[in-house]
Amino acid sequence: MKYIQTEQQIEVPEGVTVSIKSRIVKVVGPRGTLTKNLKHIDVTFTKVNNQLIKVAVHNGGRKHVAALRTVKSLVDNMITGVTKGYKYKMRYVYAHFPINVNIVEKDGAKFIEVRNFLGDKKIRNVPVRDGVTIEFSTNVKDEIVLSGNSVEDVSQNAADLQQICRVRNKDIRKFLDGIYVSHKGFITEDL
């Protein structure tokens, strides 16, 4: 079944400006700027006023309408990122060999360096994405905090770090060692 026209509305809060030119969305807010290229998705953006943007699909099927909702979610996440920011907390879990995590800089790029995972001599490196800041928690032992404006970059960095510390060829119910996401939230919490 084809839908003649389907619309989604994006509400823009005060202090945030959204500019769209040829399906490249640029969101500017108090925490910074985020840009996303949506040229591959066939949707129509209409700016009603500074506080409301309509996204529409004409003659779209079920998957095309689903892509419309995805576009709305992407822009909503960008708006949340430039107003509140995203913060992921990760904890190191180990039974015997203590995991050693450091931030190193090689050739101008930052890496998260994981040593002594399950007693391995191998050094695991995870590149830090642009716009993601990493700090070690001062009041909680074995915790690392990833924060930034883009939820995609912050969550992908957390996923990369979790994936590089997977236990292979052993029973994962017994060997629970690794670095896991313990908390997902915002940098500036609503009080």
UniProtKB/Swiss-Prot annotation:
One protein family per Pfam: Ribosomal_L6
**Entry's localization field:** Cytoplasm
Output the PROSITE patterns linked to this UniProt entry: RIBOSOMAL_L6_2
Provide this UniProt record's keywords sorted from A to Z. Answer: Cytoplasm, Ribonucleoprotein, Ribosomal protein
Cellular component aspect of the GO annotation: cytosol; cytosolic large ribosomal subunit
Entry superkingdom: Eukaryota
Instruction: Please give the chief subcellular localization of this protein.
Output: cytoplasm
Q: InterPro entries of this UniProt entry?
A: Ribosomal_uL6-like, Ribosomal_uL6-like_a/b-dom_sf, Ribosomal_uL6_a/b-dom, Ribosomal_uL6_CS2
Any single GO BP term? cytoplasmic translation
Any one GO molecular function term: rRNA binding
What SUPFAM superfamilies does the entry give? Answer: Ribosomal protein L6 (SSF56053)
Indicate the quaternary assembly: Component of the large ribosomal subunit (LSU). Mature yeast ribosomes consist of a small (40S) and a large (60S) subunit. The 40S small subunit contains 1 molecule of ribosomal RNA (18S rRNA) and 33 different proteins (encoded by 57 genes). The large 60S subunit contains 3 rRNA molecules (25S, 5.8S and 5S rRNA) and 46 different proteins (encoded by 81 genes). uL6 lines the binding pocket for eukaryotic elongation factor 2 (eEF2).
Q: State the remark under miscellaneous.
A: Present with 52400 molecules/cell in log phase SD medium.
Into which family does the record put it?
Belongs to the universal ribosomal protein uL6 family.
**What does the UniProt record say this protein does?**
Component of the ribosome, a large ribonucleoprotein complex responsible for the synthesis of proteins in the cell. The small ribosomal subunit (SSU) binds messenger RNAs (mRNAs) and translates the encoded message by selecting cognate aminoacyl-transfer RNA (tRNA) molecules. The large subunit (LSU) contains the ribosomal catalytic site termed the peptidyl transferase center (PTC), which catalyzes the formation of peptide bonds, thereby polymerizing the amino acids delivered by tRNAs into a polypeptide chain.
Name by which UniProt lists this protein: Large ribosomal subunit protein uL6A
Organism listed in the record: Saccharomyces cerevisiae (strain ATCC 204508 / S288c)
Gene name per UniProt: RPL9A
